[in-house]
């Protein structure tokens, strides 16, 4: 069965690298996902952050979060490529299940309602339109 499933990947890149080296690693990450047949939905580059503990004697990491769709059989191949890239300190790929997706929708709905008055009015109008 070759149906696409939704995944999230969080990557921590060595924060001591130059900006162009970090950009090259991010391109490698994106290229790896797309070359293996994945479709990238969203990329959030959080930036450099101090890590809670040292990883390979490094205290600063560049955090990135990628959401993509892929066939489950290629996840092991993507992980293998990430594992061999020295600039990637840590990574985690999880499959988004239905409960996680539903919870995300609820969080987005209520976070908009807690925002500005304009956002709150828009969210209430959307809720009324659904009912």
UniProtKB/Swiss-Prot annotation:
Organism: Chlorobaculum tepidum (strain ATCC 49652 / DSM 12025 / NBRC 103806 / TLS)
Gene3D superfamilies according to UniProt: 3.30.70.60
PANTHER family per the UniProt record, alphabetical: MITOCHONDRIAL 28S RIBOSOMAL PROTEIN S6, SMALL RIBOSOMAL SUBUNIT PROTEIN BS6M
InterPro entries: Ribosomal_bS6 (IPR000529), Ribosomal_bS6_sf (IPR035980), Ribosomal_S6_plastid/chlpt (IPR020814), Transl_elong_EF1B/ribsomal_bS6 (IPR014717)
Keywords: Ribonucleoprotein, Ribosomal protein, RNA-binding, rRNA-binding
GO cellular component terms listed in the entry, alphabetical order: cytoplasm; ribonucleoprotein complex; ribosome
CDD domains linked: bS6 (cd00473)
The protein's role, per its UniProt record: Binds together with bS18 to 16S ribosomal RNA.
GO molecular function, one term: structural constituent of ribosome
Ribosomal protein recorded as keyword: yes
One GO biological process term: translation
Family statement: Belongs to the bacterial ribosomal protein bS6 family.
Gene: rpsF
Lineage: Bacteria, Pseudomonadati, Chlorobiota, Chlorobiia, Chlorobiales
Record protein name field: Small ribosomal subunit protein bS6
